[in-house]
């Protein structure tokens, strides 16, 4: 047999502008003989807060497959345009994998309307300090209340982007200066690193408080993982969580402050081989997470119709919640590892720790998640070590 091709990793910026900056693609050649899955590319949007826009992999019997529910870059450039449907960068969390900072999920609070701009403004209060945060989201029902959604980095442009590649690994690094402009508790720098090799895609965000006051920060990610078989019924999920956050309804999705045990419910995804999704919209936050011996929280998405597995390992101890979003009529599962619970400053939580990390001036915190591919059929018969034992 001919030798497998020599793996080479490259980084290309010869791609369309999205958000005013060129998209970046990390790419490597398939190195194996086709028996096992391997990552091939990652496409990133530095002009849109380093959205992890697409990931592709070689899957045995299927060839190169897109792993995220996303659009074409040309379509993204048209949609991510700052227009009415892209308020505060909202289009970024409708596809690909938006990075979320300085909070993930929703902020709820008193709303006022700016008479000059028409913007809805939310008052966020932390330790007696209040700041006006742009409310960029509301539910679909008539009169649904406005809230802040998924942070303030969705449409951020990178201050600089660098790429590096060696024989089998490619990485992109982007730096974001995020002044509060009065809309957060301090100024921040965020450094994003995304690395690709055969077996892993790793995303790292490090936030540093560059202001002169302490602040709370939350970091998260919103990847829409595609089910290659195209059928939601084939999905099996593992999320090692004891509790689920109760919400007022699935339109607002505002937490009530109550945690519901998952044990014995259709939201119990603790079994090693994964559990099926309920036959209903899932838009739930799972908390009280159980780490493995290394201190990592390992979640898995399996697609039994494609012998496909995606292992999502949260490698920061500050990741306290995993949001799961899966509409009944779609073939994706958004699995979102994040620091904070929804509405982390809400009175409904009383004195509970809702996962926001306090940074004094000059302090930093890091969020890290790693993706790994596996084949459930092989995994089930013990040919691949389970992540808890690696």
Language-model segments: which ranges?
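Surface-exposed acidic/polar loop and edge beta-strand patches at domain peripheries
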Residues: 5-204, 210-216, 223-390
């Amino acid at each position: 047999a001919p030798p497998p091709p020599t793996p080479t990793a490259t980084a290309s910026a010869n791609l369309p502008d999205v958000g005013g900056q060129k998209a970046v693609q990390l790419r490597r050649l398939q190195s194996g003989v086709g028996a096992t899955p391997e990552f091939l590319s990652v496409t990133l949007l530095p002009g849109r807060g380093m959205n992890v826009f697409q990931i592709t992999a070689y899957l045995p019997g299927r060839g190169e497959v897109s792993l995220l529910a996303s659009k074409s870059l040309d379509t993204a450039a048209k949609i991510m345009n700052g227009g009415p449907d892209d308020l505060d960068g909202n289009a970024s969390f409708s596809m690909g994998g938006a990075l979320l900072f300085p909070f993930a999920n929703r902020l709820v609070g008193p709303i006022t309307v700016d008479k000059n701009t028409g913007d809805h403004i939310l008052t966020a209060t932390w330790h007696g300090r209040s700041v006006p945060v742009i409310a960029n989201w509301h539910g679909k029902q008539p009169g649904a209340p406005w809230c802040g959604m998924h942070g303030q980095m969705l449409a951020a442009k990178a201050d600089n982007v660098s790429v590096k590649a060696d024989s089998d690994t490619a990485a992109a690094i982007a730096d974001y200066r995020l002044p509060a402009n009065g809309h957060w508790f301090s100024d921040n720098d965020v450094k994003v690193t995304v690395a690709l090799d055969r077996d892993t895609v790793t995303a790292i965000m490090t936030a540093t408080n560059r202001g002169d006051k302490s602040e709370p920060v939350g970091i998260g990610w919103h990847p829409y993982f595609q089910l290659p078989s195209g059928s939601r019924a084939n999905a099996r999920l593992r999320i090692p969580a004891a509790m689920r956050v109760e919400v007022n309804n699935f339109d607002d999705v505002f937490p009530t402050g109550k945690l519901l045990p998952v044990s014995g419910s259709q939201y119990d995804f603790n079994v090693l081989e994964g559990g099926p999704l309920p036959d209903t919209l899932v838009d739930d936050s799972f908390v009280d997470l159980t780490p493995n011996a290394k201190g990592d929280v390992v979640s898995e998405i399996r697609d039994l119709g494609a012998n496909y597995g995606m292992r999502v390992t949260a490698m920061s101890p500050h990741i306290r919640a995993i949001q799961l979003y899966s509409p009944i009529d779609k073939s994706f599962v958004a699995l979102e590892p994040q620091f904070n619970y929804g509405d982390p400053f809400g009175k409904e939580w009383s004195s509970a720790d809702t996962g926001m990390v306090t940074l004094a001036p000059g302090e930093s915190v890091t969020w890290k998640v790693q993706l790994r591919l596996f084949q459930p059929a092989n995994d089930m018969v013990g040919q691949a070590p389970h992540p808890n034992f690696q």
